[in-house]
Swiss-Prot record:
This is Tetratricopeptide repeat protein 7A. It comes from Mus musculus. One of its GO terms (cellular component) is cytoplasm. Its main location: cytoplasm. Keywords: Cell membrane, Cytoplasm, Membrane, Phosphoprotein, Repeat, TPR repeat. Gene3D superfamilies: Tetratricopeptide repeat domain. One of its GO terms (biological process) is hemopoiesis.
Length: 858
């Protein structure tokens, strides 16, 4: 019974030794080594145990086996304590760490005595090879592994810890070969060495994955047999196991072997994961996503289940064939998802990585976890950066903002994440939220001028929050020289804010003051950045707004020398020509600009006005047809792409709807149905368009600018039809616009114009009043209402409305003309003459469309 009990104890201790060596529990190894010495037995291998369980204890020298265990434990403890030095390839010195010296003495003694069986002698060589590497003796490490014959070692039916030793041996051999001096080696020998390095790394990766899968399987089985026992702690990867997992793909990618690097990464990600490899797989997925985004175009992509292009394979040399008997288990099945392009695969990888990274991120602010928190935040931030690139390339800014919002739980005090979220909100059109986020970014980095500058840009553009824009621009200017290149942009933002405030001001004195401040501020920006074409352009635009046409032309020519094809600059040039009454020159410039920017509707609206003045409404209606055709083309394109670009026509977010086609009405006589000779150009509109029209039941989806543009096209066509006295067709166009925005002030105003042309003055007056209620600052509405009131005999009220119009926009010459006519009817001839003279003066410098139609934005 005593012998049977001793035998059971021997088995238990031996199994515990193997388990601790596999799991890396090196502190426990010292206790087990002492236990073995007390028992006076050897720790025979599991293969011996299987073959001869009763005779293994007398064939081994206990002291030598204990030395082997102690040497490995001492070395592993030393490596764990010097992880950073090992990672940075800093050799460890025996004199600075006694454990290294003791381990080396034990191993040298074992190999010199040669009393251990071959299995343990081989293990001693593998451990000593690792020790040589950390000492910086790379040639000795390679020699020791050659002596151990690692290329011929099999992992079948071996203890788990031997698989770990073999995996580490392969990666260390590869690392040692990389670090050997190559000054005297031939080119052929260097190439062979490189191939051998890659082969070592590949084998190390395969063996490491098999080891970790088997280790977890063994641990799970052990836990299921001892349900009442405590769960074993998660396995912590050593430096060399981490290197074994990733060195193969890192080496291939560094050499430019994209195919092999991607193959390694994809195989790693397809292997059945373990707890120990979860974090590593996040890193691998991030690496593969980076390769897909930065090193592979969509034309060269191949899916995980297909083969790469032949030209890729021809460029990369053949590597050694890895003769691994066992392969790691892969995820397999009939319904596995397979990406179709590199963006799709990268997005899938990053979304998986993001879910894991945000789940495991360290949120604690405790000082002892500061380093872990820093590393986890860096990993999460890198993933979100790649997500920004991936989703940005597809224009999926809403999805990006949703992803980045999930990062806010770990973004406390992290400027980069806050700024990324803010930028994503800007891109997806959530401008007010973006400004709030940018305010927080300013608190985190108050000396960074780009943050308030971005906030000013958003406030000036989509929000029209001019007071806030003024504040943010002032913050940039307040940084002074610290703002660097952003300082001129700060003055530009402030100048544009003053200019927009002048446009919004209701008193002429306030308008003049703000225009003066805008011009002074913009000139200051030009002094700081004399070669910035954007600043010079806005100086020219500001001069045009205050009707300094000659000065504006000089500045604009200066800007055009730097940016000949800029759409806004060419647009302003055309408007300046039209203000000087050079309509043909203006039309030539607009046509040239449209050639360069065929999807710019602002240019086409100006072209319509120029053609209306120069050639009559017939030619202008042809351009309206082109605008409708362009709108429909962009709309159809948006159904296919579904890209998100707020406020842009380059990929509109509009869900597919069948049956949307646009056409202007047939220009027939309402009574006889015969075609008028004057309507030949207008009749050509329907020949290019479908018979179906945009019905009122269509749901408006996508950026509002898309639909307001369509509304303006219909209303512009209605105005042209009214000029030709084709009132039925004009009514049809207004009806189409009303189907989009029934209460729009533009629609109400045009309905009033149509009623006025028809002679329904009371109806026209009521519609003008409704339009003015919706848009109290509409000077054209005021002008038409004033004239209508005058025609109905309400002279005093007409005078008041027209005075409000000229006070609201002092450069509107038509309102001055109308006011003069009303004053003349009231017998105030002297005041009327002043109004007529002002109207003549302003008309001499009035463009076909107001200069303010050109966007003022950063």
């Amino acid at each position: 019974m005593a012998a049977k009990g001793a035998h059971g104890t021997h088995l238990k201790v031996e199994s515990e030794v193997e388990r601790c060596r596999a799991e890396g529990q090196w502190d426990r190894m010292f206790e087990l080594a002492r236990h073995l010495q007390m028992l006076g037995i050897s720790g025979g291998g599991s293969s011996n145990r299987r073959n001869s369980p009763s005779g293994r204890f007398t064939t081994l020298d206990t002291d030598d086996f204990v030395k082997l265990l102690l040497a490995e434990a001492l070395l592993e403890q030393c490596l764990k304590d010097n992880h950073d030095k090992i990672k940075n390839s800093i050799p460890l010195l025996e004199k600075t760490d006694h454990r290294l010296n003791e381990a080396k003495d034990h191993l040298s003694s074992l190999l010199n005595n040669g009393k251990l069986p071959p299995q343990y002698m081989c293990e001693a060589m593998l451990i000593l090879g690792k020790l040589h590497y950390v000492e910086g003796s790379y040639r000795d490490a390679v020699s020791m592994y050659a002596r151990a014959g690692i290329d011929d070692i099999s992992v079948e039916n071996k203890p788990l810890y031997q698989m770990r030793l073999l995996s580490e041996a392969f990666v260390i051999k590869g690392l040692s070969l990389e670090r050997l001096p190559n000054s005297v080696a031939s080119h052929i020998r260097l190439t062979e060495r490189e191939e051998e390095v890659v082969a070592c790394f590949e084998r190390a990766s395969w063996v490491a994955q098999v080891f970790l899968q088997e280790l977890e399987k063994t641990s799970n089985n052990s836990t299921s047999r001892h349900l009442k026992g405590s769960l074993s702690p998660d396995y912590e990867l050593s430096y060399f196991l981490e290197a074994a997992l990733q060195s193969a793909y890192v080496k291939n990618l560094k050499k430019g072997n994209i195919v092999k690097g991607m193959r390694e990464l994809r195989e790693i990600l397809r292997t059945v994961e373990t707890k120990a490899t979860q974090n590593f797989k996040v890193v691998a997925a991030k690496h593969l996503a980076g390769v897909l985004l930065h090193s592979l175009s969509e034309d060269c992509y191949w899916s995980p289940l297909s083969h790469p292009l032949p030209e890729f394979m021809n460029k990369e040399e053949n590597s050694f064939v890895t003769q691994t008997l066992r392969k790691p288990h892969l995820y397999e099945g009939d319904n596995l998802y397979c990406p179709k392009d590199n963006i799709e695969e990268a997005l899938l990888l990053l979304l998986i990585s993001e879910s894991m990274a945000t789940r495991d991120v360290v949120l604690s602010r405790a000082p002892e976890q500061a380093e872990d928190r820093k590393v986890s935040l860096q990993n999460a931030s890198a993933i979100y950066d790649l997500l920004s690139i991936t989703l940005g390339r597809r224009g999926q800014y809403v999805m990006l903002s949703e992803c980045l919002e999930r990062a806010m739980k770990c973004a406390f005090g992290e400027f980069h994440l806050w700024y990324q979220v803010a930028l994503s909100m800007v891109a997806c059109g959530k401008s007010a939220y973006a400004v709030s986020l940018l305010r927080e970014c300013m608190k985190l980095q108050p000396s960074d001028p780009t943050v308030p500058l971005m906030a000013a840009k958003v406030c000036i553009g989509s929000l029209h929050w001019l007071e806030e824009a003024e504040h943010f621009a002032t913050v940039v200017i307040g940084l002074g020289e610290e703002a660097g290149e952003s300082l001129p942009k700060g003055y530009l933002a402030l100048g544009l804010t003053y200019s927009l405030q002048a446009t919004d001001a209701t008193l002429k004195s306030k308008q003049d003051e703000l225009h003066r401040k805008a011009l002074q501020t913009l000139e200051r920006a030009r002094e700081l950045a004399p070669d910035d074409p954007q600043i010079i352009f806005y100086v020219a635009l500001q001069l045009a707004l205050v009707r300094q046409i000659s000065s504006a032309m000089e500045r604009l020519q200066e800007a055009l020398t730097m940016c000949r094809d800029d759409a806004n600059a060419l647009h302003l040039l055309a408007l300046l020509f039209s203000a000087q009454k050079y309509y043909q020159h203006a039309l030539d410039v607009i046509n040239m600009a449209i050639t360069e920017h065929p999807e710019n509707f602002n240019l086409m609206f100006t072209k319509v006005k120029l053609e209306q003045v120069l050639k009559g409404p017939e030619e202008a209606l042809v351009t309206c047809r082109q605008m409708l055709r362009l709108w429909q083309t962009l709309y159809n394109f948006s159904q296919l792409g579904g890209l998100e670009k707020d406020g842009s026509f380059e990929g509109l977010t509009v869900k597919k709807q069948n049956g949307i086609h646009l056409t202007l009405p047939d220009a027939h006589d309402a009574d006889s149905g015969s075609r008028r000779a004057s309507s030949i150009a207008a009749s050509r509109l329907e020949e290019a368009m479908s018979e179906l029209t945009l019905t009122t039941s269509v749901l408006k989806q996508g950026p509002m600018q898309l639909w307001t543009t369509l509304e303006q096209i219909w209303l512009q066509a209605a105005e042209l039809f009214m000029e030709q006295r084709q009132l039925k067709e004009a009514g049809f166009c207004i009806q189409e616009a009303a189907g989009l925005f029934p209460t729009s002030h533009s629609v109400l105003y045009m309905r009033g114009r149509l009623a006025e042309v028809k002679g329904s003055f009371e109806e026209a007056k009521q519609l003008y009043k409704e339009a003015l209620t919706v848009n109290p600052d509409g000077v054209r509405i005021m002008h038409s209402l004033g004239l209508m009131l005058s025609q109905l005999g309400h002279k005093s009220l007409a005078q008041k409305v027209l005075r409000d119009a000229v006070e609201r926009q002092s450069t509107f010459h038509e309102a001055w003309q109308g006011l003069g006519e009303v004053l003349q009817d009231q017998g105030q001839n002297e005041a009327a003459v002043d109004c007529f003279l002002t109207a003549l003066e302003l008309e001499a410098s009035s463009p076909v469309l107001p200069f303010s139609i050109i966007a003022r934005e950063l």
